[in-house]
Regions:
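Non-heme Fe(II)/2-oxoglutarate
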Residues: 1-77
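Catalytic core of non-heme Fe(II) oxygenases with the double-stranded beta-helix
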Residues: 79-194
Length: 194
């Protein structure tokens, strides 16, 4: 397992080999089309399903394992991790993920990719504070610069057992280029870290 800061800001980390191979292999044997799910409520995420793992399944085992990583994450991130909650996302045909900044309600987040889906990983951009507008809405932070942003801070490859941890702030602009085609599916574990 490796958790490495992508630069000297130490608020964005690459995560590699976090999940034990036996759990990862068991998760990838599951027929994802048979797993219960909730559709995401936002229009831009209409091609995203939040999978609901069955009790006792390999997916539930993975969620339980992730909850045991408080000390590992605390040591790597430099702050005390109290809770790790997670959900499984399955993105399919026509999924888009435009550049955005998470709202301040998300303190820190981790996304671990569970399959390979080339050229669809999350891209974090280098933006200046003056390109961010604060609004009195649920999103709060809004990027006002050029689309797509000119400067890439780091691009994470959508590869099995790879991903990132983001400590949220008003300049953590991120998204995915393009749109998934009919043969592409992104399967990941998304975690809220507090």
């Amino acid at each position: 397992m490796r958790i490495t800061a992508v630069d000297d800001k130490k608020n964005l980390f690459e995560v590699r080999d976090l999940i034990p191979m036996d759990i990862l292999e068991a998760v990838n044997k599951i027929d994802l089309d048979q797993v219960p799910y909730d559709k995401m409520g936002w229009l831009e995420f209409s091609s995203r399903k939040a999978l609901q793992p069955l009790d006792g399944s390999a997916m539930a085992e993975l969620q339980n394992y992730i909850k045991t990583l408080h000390n590992v994450l605390s040591d790597s991130l430099g702050f005390k991790v109290h809770t790790i909650e997670s959900t499984f996302w399955l993105d399919s045909h026509n999924f888009i993920f435009p550049a955005h900044i998470d709202n301040p309600g998300i303190e820190s987040a981790m996304q671990i990719y569970l399959n390979d889906c080339p050229n669809t990983g999350t891209i974090f951009y280098q933006v200046e504070p003056e390109e961010i507008e604060d609004k009195d809405d649920s999103q709060k932070w809004h990027y006002t610069g050029t689309i797509p942003p000119r400067s890439i801070r780091h691009e994470f490859a959508f590869e099995k057992n790879n991903g990132y941890i983001m400590i949220n702030n008003r300049t953590q602009l991120h998204g995915m280029n393009g749109k998934l085609n009919a043969s592409q599916r992104r399967f990941s574990l998304y975690c809220w870290i507090n």
